[in-house]
Amino acid sequence: MNTPAPDIDDALILDSIDQFLERDVRPVVRELEANDVYPQEIVDQLIQLGLFGATIAPEYGGLGLSARTYAKIIERISAVWMSVSGFFNSHLIMAAAVQRFGRDEQKQQFLHRFASGELRGGIALTEPDCGTDLQAIRTRAVKDGEEYVVNGSKTWITNSSAC
């Protein structure tokens, strides 16, 4: 995604994440998962660690981490609690779409706020009759004048409560 950070920086970042996971996440995973509780405090800590801007370019307030470092972060988080990596990943997938394909004004409007955690990216992929099969989705966005009209059904939208 971006220029790789030096190995020493990778090691420091990964060590911080490992400490966070062992101290704040692993001890509460079973309880929160069993009670179907959204881990807001954990998400807030991911934001404080700068991880909601992990792959966003520094010019937009992000860390600008390499794809390699990002993959290592996701691997570590997923090993402790897969659900948390889903919130984080979905957010950064949306941020990557804006960073790569957005107009300059969209980048200015959204990327700083994504990086700070003020806004969260969400993904509306899963549908009742096809799951996450992109070839089978039925939801459509059709331009109608200056707007798009979206029609379809989704089973859930990752991060929708925070978008």
Where are these regions (language model features)?
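Short hydrophobic "helix-edge" motifs at membrane interfaces and signal-peptide entry regions
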Residues: I47-Q48, I93-M94, V142-K143
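N-terminal glycine-rich flavin-associated loop
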Residues: M82-E105, G131-L134
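Amphipathic, small/basic residue-rich leader segments at the start of a protein or domain
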Residues: M1-F88, E105-S116
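A generic signature of intrinsically disordered, low-complexity regions enriched in glycine/proline
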Residues: I13-L14, I93, I137, C163
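Conserved short loop/turn motifs at secondary-structure junctions
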Residues: E31-N35, P58-G62, M94-R100, T126-D129
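Glycine-rich, Trp-frequent "lid" loop and neighboring beta-strands that shape
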Residues: G62-L63, E105-C163
